[in-house]
Design a protein with these regions (language model features):
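N-terminal membrane-targeting/pre-transmembrane regions
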Residues: 1-8, 52-138, 273, 278
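Terminal and domain-flanking low-complexity segments
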Residues: 15-22, 37-90, 223-279
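Conserved beta-hairpin
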Residues: 57, 152-197
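Alpha-helical membrane-embedding segments
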Residues: 66-80, 96-103, 174-189, 203-214
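Non-transmembrane, membrane-adjacent beta-strand/coil modules in membrane-associated proteins
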Residues: 181-245
């Protein structure tokens, strides 16, 4: 057995215990110093062991990304990566720097129809933050923790919209890239597309093999594939799809661009095979 599996099992036991202890301390529960000391030693030992195994994996030739992937479960990595992408999207949104559009043949924003709803959510969260600050003013520890959580909630909601605003659908070369916020990034080769059509839908029933990237509860372009393409879920579970429905601020432009790209790809002349070999 490699040392990675025991470390993961230890982390699953130690980290929840640490969370419970923190919750007890916040709630005013008196915990013996011995218990706190043992918990801190376990956490420090776990971090030290993780660091040593990481160095060992690096010496075996693994890249930084691969070494971290060996130590940390994929769902945890994907969740952390998602949160980091949301925070990075806020910076891109302020700087007006869209993601993944360099060298694109077509860029198709899709966040306009959700903007009012997301701003409304952010406003409600901000009001709730102010209200909780007044209600918890007598309990400074609880007030501080709830304030951090509330502020992060506001940033999270704004980050969701910022991720959609800075990650448009992109047509580049022979690949159609369809995205939603920071959790869906689907690359479809044009030779996998059977058909594309302009189709506005406001209700979507869940079905195997279908992916609906609705914005404002609507989709406006439907892409059917000749073979399944994997669209991993948030935690990494595979999700093969053969029908993808998306929305764009200008759906006609997206439909026209994809349709024209398909026509060019299918009518392109075959390469010259060259002269026959001499016998």
């Amino acid at each position: 057995m490699t040392p990675v599996r025991p470390l993961r099992l230890l982390a699953y036991a130690v980290l929840p215990l640490e969370v419970v202890l923190v919750g007890c301390l916040i709630g005013g529960v008196r915990i013996p110093a011995v218990v706190l000391g043992v918990a801190e030693v376990l956490v420090a030992g776990l971090l030290l062991a993780e660091g040593l195994v990481y160095l060992r994996l690096r010496r075996r030739g693994l890249s930084r990304r691969d070494a971290v992937a060996e130590l940390v479960p994929e769902p945890v990595l994907r969740l952390v990566g998602h949160e980091l992408r949301l925070l990075a999207s806020l910076g891109r949104w302020v700087a007006r720097r869209p993601h993944g559009t360099a060298g694109a043949d077509g860029v198709f924003p899709h966040a306009r129809d959700q903007a009012a709803l997301m701003y409304g959510f952010a406003f409600v969260c901000a009001v709730e933050t102010v209200g909780m600050s007044f209600l918890l003013a007598r309990w400074p520890v609880v007030h501080g923790i709830v304030l951090v959580l509330d502020v992060y909630t506001v940033l999270f909601v704004l980050g969701l919209h910022a991720a959609s605003a800075t990650r448009p659908h992109v047509l580049a070369g022979d690949v159609l890239r369809l995205r939603q916020a920071a959790h869906v990034d689907l690359r479809i080769p044009l030779d996998r597309i059977a058909s594309v059509r302009r189709e506005t839908l406001f209700s979507h029933e869940k079905a195997d093999g279908e992916l609906n990237l609705a914005v404002g509860a609507q989709t406006s372009v439907t892409v059917e594939l000749t073979a399944p393409v994997d669209a991993p879920r948030l935690l990494g579970a595979p999700r093969p799809v053969r029908v993808v429905r998306v929305h764009a601020d200008d759906p006609q432009a997206l439909y026209r661009a994809v349709d024209e790209a398909l026509t060019r790809a299918r009518t392109a002349p075959s390469p010259d095979p060259g002269p026959p070999p001499r016998v």
